């Protein structure tokens, strides 16, 4: 089996899926206490880096995605599939798991 080299540019989401770079989680509490990895909350915010062509409708047409590359999004806490590429973490989500576009 041949090895596959993955990078952000080689990941092409299918259908209504969206590839999101996860924002860094907080390293400290508001009071300045350092958090161990096991105590950190799973981030729910990230930046869209790839977007699929959209959801297929019953008539064969595509519904264009509501988000685009560069949008900062808020998504469901346990949604999607986590993927690590190099030192960066990503999540592959269905568009329905995105709750809002933020700031």
UniProtKB/Swiss-Prot annotation:
Record-linked SUPFAM superfamilies: GroES-like (SSF50129)
Listed GO MF terms: ATP binding; metal ion binding; protein folding chaperone; protein-folding chaperone binding; unfolded protein binding
Database matches in Pfam families: Cpn10
Keyword Chaperone: yes
Major location category of this protein: cytoplasm
Cell compartment(s), UniProt: Cytoplasm
Origin superkingdom: Bacteria
GO CC terms of this entry: cytoplasm
Keyword annotations of the record: Chaperone, Cytoplasm
Biological process (GO), any one: chaperone cofactor-dependent protein refolding
InterPro entries, A to Z: Chaperonin_GroES, Chaperonin_GroES_sf, Chaprnonin_Cpn10_CS, GroES-like_sf
Role of this protein: Together with the chaperonin GroEL, plays an essential role in assisting protein folding. The GroEL-GroES system forms a nano-cage that allows encapsulation of the non-native substrate proteins and provides a physical environment optimized to promote and accelerate protein folding. GroES binds to the apical surface of the GroEL ring, thereby capping the opening of the GroEL channel.
Family: Belongs to the GroES chaperonin family.
Subunit comment: Heptamer of 7 subunits arranged in a ring. Interacts with the chaperonin GroEL.
Entry protein name: Co-chaperonin GroES
Gene expressing this chain: groES
